[in-house]
Amino acid sequence: VFCSNPVEGYRHTTDKYSYDVLKKKVFDYKRGLQTFVKFDEVGDYFNLTGGEPTLHPDFLKILALIRTEFPQNLIRLLSNGRTMADPDFARRTCGIGGHPFEIAVPMFGGDARSHEAISRTPGSFAQTSEGLRNLQKHRKPGQIVEIRIIMTKVQARFLDGLVDYLLAEFPWVDRVVFLYEEIEGFAEMYKDRLLFTQSECSAHIDRNYDKLKKFKDVRMYHFSLCAVPTRLWPHVWNTLAGFKITWLEGCRTKCQYRDQCVGVHRSYVKHTGAPDIAPIETPRPVTFTGDPYHPILSSDGDAVRA
């Protein structure tokens, strides 16, 4: 919906993201105008993202506006969680968010040193952790709290300790999501430090397989099935917009799981050449859901570690 702290700074975007401008966009959207970008065919929902959306001086007013005008629609807040360290702010956010409402918060490490090596903000580990505790305390029935882990080469070094920390401190979270990094924007400047293959990435996740089974729901976004161990397939969700993906030679015609796979992110092909992407020509022991966004229900994959 808005970017409250873009690269050029907030003062240059008041004409785009002020409360009055956003209010007009919300009402225009309600009238049927395409004032917000829509990425897929799922029923309308609102992503509040940024930057850090909760830093917007009118964040709570904007949240209230959307909830009032669209009382039945999902609102998903993507936040670093630090503002939620203020218990009153967490309480008001959950109270205004209503239902359906989701909050997704990234965590980078299981202690201050590892977390802040990535966040680059002293004190952010304690703030984000406290924010999650406040969300647990103040969330309303049916509201979902999600922890996101952005998988890069740097993040992978801290993954084992992070999973241990999450199990110890936040076993109650509704969802843990692993996102394979999209190499775009600033990430392109540091791709040599961040980038590794999907196969290497999924191997780090698979190493924590037994621990991850203890969470309520574990998901993997932006992964091609051929780069993921079969036993992890039930956790793979297809969330990439169509304009972001492509298909390699043979994948459309030879792969047994073409209809269940998200495809390949164009940036992955651009920056790595997609060396681990290839059609799967032999069937695997899996059960389908019929849901294009969550295609695999179960797998007898412990015996098939592709």
Can you describe what each PLM-predicted range is?
Residues V1, E8, F108-G110, E181-E184:
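Short connector loops/turns at beta-strand edges and beta->alpha or beta->beta junctions
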Residues V1-K24:
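Canonical Radical SAM [4Fe-4S] cluster-binding loop centered on the CxxxCxxC motif
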Residues P6, V228-A306:
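Flexible mid-to-C-terminal extensions adjoining Fe-S/redox cofactors in radical SAM and related proteins
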Residues G9-T13, D111-S119, G185-K191:
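A short acidic, helix-capping loop that chelates divalent metal ions and anchors anionic groups
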Residues D15-S18, L22, T121-S124, Q155, ...:
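Residue-level preference for long, well-ordered alpha-helices that form the structural scaffold
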Residues V26, K30-N47, H56-L179:
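Radical SAM/AdoMet-radical enzyme domain recognition
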Residues Q143-I144, A156-G161, A168-E169, D174-Q260:
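A C-terminal junction/extension of Radical SAM enzymes
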